[in-house]
Structure formats: C-alpha cells, structure tokens
Curated annotation (Swiss-Prot):
Protein's name in the database: Cilia- and flagella-associated protein HOATZ
Any one biological process term the GO annotation gives: cilium assembly
Cited InterPro entries: HOATZ-like (IPR040681)
Cross-referenced PANTHER family: CILIA- AND FLAGELLA-ASSOCIATED PROTEIN HOATZ (PTHR47231:SF1), UPF0722 PROTEIN C11ORF88 (PTHR47231)
Family membership: Belongs to the HOATZ family.
Biased composition range(s): Basic and acidic residues: 144-155
Comp. bias (Acidic residues): 162-172
Lineage per the UniProt record: Eukaryota, Metazoa, Chordata, Cephalochordata, Leptocardii
Region (Disordered): 144-189
Record organism: Branchiostoma floridae
Length: 189
C-alpha cells in the first residue's frame, strides 16, 4: 500500500466533497477522523474501507452485562447425584474372542516377517545379478582394450576429365566385345 497520511488541521486541504470521493483516496475512521491513502489503487482502498468498518471495539468491563469471571458461573453438580453411565464402560471380552484376536495378531506378524524375508531374498538376488553383469561388462571392456580396430582411411576420388575418357573407353571395349562375341555366335552356327 502507499503511504498513509493522517489529516491534521495543518494538512487539511480544501477539496470539494465530490472530487474527494471520486479519487477513492480516503477512509473515514472513528479514531482519527479521515485517513488519506495517496497513490493507492481503488481495490486497496476498498479493502481498507472494509477493514476499518469491520473493527469494533469491545466495551469496558464495567459496562458489560455478563462477565467472564468464574464467580458468575454455575456450580458443577457433585458426582454422587449422577447415575452411572454404562454406555461408556468397556465390555469385558470373552476368553475365546481374546484368544482369537491374539492368534490373528500372531498370524499377521508371521505373514509380515515372511514378506520381509522374501523381499530381502529378492533384493539379494538383484544385487548378485547386477554384480554379475558388472563383472561381465568389465571383462568385455578388458577384451576391447587389447584389441584396437584399424582406422579406415578412405580415399576420395574426384572425377577429372581423364576419368570421363576412361569411362567411355570401357563402353567402347564393351561394344567391341559384344561385336566379337556376335561374330563368334554366327560362326558357331
């Protein structure tokens, strides 16, 4: 929020009532008169107005009709006058029920310990498998360290004008070969 300026007679500015309310820049308070919120948004001013309107001061103790003092409270009735409430007393359990509940509790405990044992066995198996895989990987890495692959260097062959002539030469040679073969085929008939 912006600065809060409380009006005093020295700071009282002659503003007409409409302009003063249009700015939404003030709040009337019961304690100090008017409070001006300069530079505050209208939303902040509305929140402040609601806040100041919601504040109610409690009257002094002398003017209250009822006091919170313990002397005005009613006395508590003695326990001897109250009938015994059987609804809140625990019902005694039968021996069969007690034995059944104890057995069920033991069975749950046994099942839980078995489950934990199975989980620990499974965890150990997973750790052994990871260890085995790690050892195999390390063996493969050792084998690869001893064997270094040859680096392949490929020569890039750029075509030149002599290459074009060479390409034509095989074509001519192929034509000559086909002609010679054609003559041989005719001779073989």
């Amino acid at each position: 929020m912006a600065d809060v300026i409380e009006n005093s007679p020295a700071l009282d500015v002659n503003l007409d009532e409409e302009n003063y309310f249009d700015d939404s820049c003030h709040i009337d308070t019961p304690v100090t008169g008017k409070t001006i919120f300069c530079g505050s948004s209208k939303e902040d001013v509305e929140y402040a107005k609601v806040f100041w309107k919601s504040i109610t001061l409690q009257p002094p103790m002398e003017s209250r009709l009822v006091s919170g003092d313990t002397r005005q409270r009613l006395k508590v009735a003695s326990a001897s006058f109250q009938p015994k409430n059987f609804a809140h007393e625990p019902v005694p359990d039968s021996p069969r029920l007690t034995q059944f509940l104890e057995e069920a509790h033991r069975q749950e405990h046994v099942e839980e310990t078995e489950k934990r044992r199975q989980l620990s066995i499974k965890k150990e198996q997973q750790q052994l498998l990871l260890q085995k895989q790690r050892e195999e990987r390390m063996q493969r890495e050792e084998i690869l360290r001893g064997h270094k692959p040859r680096q392949r260097t490929e020569l890039i062959h750029l075509p030149t004008s002599s290459d074009e002539e060479q390409e034509e030469d095989p074509m001519l040679e192929l034509d000559k070969f086909e002609q010679a073969k054609g003559l041989q085929d005719l001779d073989s008939d």
